């Protein structure tokens, strides 16, 4: 995969040289470039200007963004504008991006964008219902979430398939050694070696956690008959005040 990032602060992306994204680069699975669009700005390298009609703050000018993208060698890239008013970023969207060959991220700054910039983009995406100083942190988050889904980046395919949100549910609780730590013990079912019991326990705990913490995820979840029965059991227990 090839990723190009338009930003005023390329140095902010140093963390992407480490961990999973860094390893993807080392394996030759990822080619990532940072472009300071101030280098392409006319008018004394100014990238912002006052909005027509008045208003608070400054807007990112169209010219530096257009010129930067036009010099990037890409065949048919997915061009993503980081915008608080965009569509929410999700695990499903990250999985969609992981199938692409070329991605371009535009990191904004200031009060907003000249609307004409949006004629370049294929996607307007928001990290969440909050406002950041710029798009850099959002872009780093999206790149990390996407790159780890590229085949061969993680050691095992199942490493990300069991993640929270990949299945549509939150991930079940997990434990490692020792069995007893300060009086807190590992659930007996996980020590049983009984694969079917373990599978059912994990599914039930995943449903329970999702029901308690993110019930909104269940609204559009496609339940199997088994999952529906387990959820009904969980809700009945919760209604009765059981843990």
Curated annotation (Swiss-Prot):
The EC category is transferase
Keyword tRNA processing appears in the UniProt entry: yes
Q: Which GO terms describe its biological process?
A: tRNA N1-guanine methylation
**Swiss-Prot/TrEMBL keywords:** Cytoplasm, Methyltransferase, S-adenosyl-L-methionine, Transferase, tRNA processing
Please tell me where S-adenosyl-L-methionine binds in this chain. 108, 127-132
List the molecular function annotations (GO) for this entry.
Answer: tRNA (guanine(37)-N1)-methyltransferase activity
Q: What domain of life does the native source organism fall in?
A: Bacteria
Localization terms from the record: Cytoplasm
Enzyme Commission number, as recorded: 2.1.1.228
Main localization is cytoplasm
Q: Which InterPro entries match?
A: Alpha/beta_knot_MTases, tRNA_m1G_MeTrfase_C_sf, tRNA_m1G_MeTrfase_TrmD, tRNA_m1G_MTases_N, tRNA_MeTrfase_TRMD/TRM10
Q: Which GO terms describe its cellular component?
A: cytosol
**Catalyzed chemical reaction(s):** guanosine(37) in tRNA + S-adenosyl-L-methionine = N(1)-methylguanosine(37) in tRNA + S-adenosyl-L-homocysteine + H(+)
Q: Which family does it belong to?
A: Belongs to the RNA methyltransferase TrmD family.
What is this protein for, i.e. what is its function?
A: Specifically methylates guanosine-37 in various tRNAs.
What does the record note on quaternary structure?
Answer: Homodimer.
Protein's name according to its UniProt entry: tRNA (guanine-N(1)-)-methyltransferase
Which organism's genome codes for this protein?
Streptococcus pyogenes serotype M2 (strain MGAS10270)
Q: Which gene encodes it?
A: trmD
């Amino acid at each position: 995969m090839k990723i190009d990032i338009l930003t005023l602060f390329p140095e902010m992306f140093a963390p992407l040289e480490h961990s999973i994204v860094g390893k993807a680069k080392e394996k030759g699975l990822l080619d990532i470039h940072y472009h300071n669009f101030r280098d392409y700005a006319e008018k004394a390298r100014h990238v912002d200007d006052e909005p027509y009609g008045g208003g608070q703050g400054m807007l990112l000018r169209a010219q530096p963004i257009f010129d930067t993208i036009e010099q990037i060698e890409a065949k048919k890239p997915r061009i993503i504008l980081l915008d608080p008013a965009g569509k929410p970023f999700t695990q499903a969207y990250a999985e969609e991006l992981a199938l692409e060959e070329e991605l371009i991220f535009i990191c904004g700054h200031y009060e907003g964008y000249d609307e004409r910039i949006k004629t370049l983009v294929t996607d307007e995406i928001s990290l969440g219902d909050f406002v950041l100083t710029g798009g850099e942190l959002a872009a780093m988050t999206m790149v990390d979430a996407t790159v780890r889904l590229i085949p061969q980046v993680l050691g095992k395919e199942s490493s990300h398939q069991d993640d929270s949100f990949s299945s549509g549910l939150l991930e079940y609780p997990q434990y490692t050694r020792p069995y007893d730590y300060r009086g807190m013990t590992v659930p007996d079912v996980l020590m049983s070696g009984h694969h079917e019991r373990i599978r059912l326990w994990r599914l039930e705990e995943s449903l329970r956690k999702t029901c308690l913490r993110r019930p909104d995820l269940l609204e559009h979840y496609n339940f199997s008959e088994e999952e529906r029965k387990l959820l009904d059991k969980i809700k009945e227990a919760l209604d009765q005040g059981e843990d």
